Amino acid sequence: MTQQRSQPTQRTLAVATLLASLLPSIDVPARTNDPTIDFNRDIRTTLADKCYQCHGPDANQRKAKLRLDTEEGAFRNEDGVRPFVAGKPSESEAYRRITTDDPDDLMPPPDSELSLTDTEKELIRRWIEQGAKWQ
């Protein structure tokens, strides 16, 4: 009788051990696992979803003559103001605008009904700190 009770317990333990050994192989999104921020994987989609409507390829819709869909536009220096400054989030106007509490400066503007999540803001900050490599 003891043997019958221990068999299910041993099987349960074996299954639990097997499942526990598989946990590290579960694919967690690269955004949280990879300390290196990849522009195409982590940044481009956020810019496309939240910024390109007003700062993208459509010249008729573009605001402030700013393009964030091209490397040239994203790093241009317009009167000492640059959207992204590699290695320097505090000098990056785009980062300042997405993190400000001032509704007059906030991007995307509140009336657009778009906003960046804290995770998206953090990824952009880390990307800038890591050199803002454009791909």
Give the residues covered by each predicted segment:
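Aromatic- and Gly/Pro-enriched helix-to-coil junctions and flexible linker segments
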Residues: T2, I26-Q135
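Bacterial N-terminal signal peptides that target proteins for export
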Residues: T2-V15
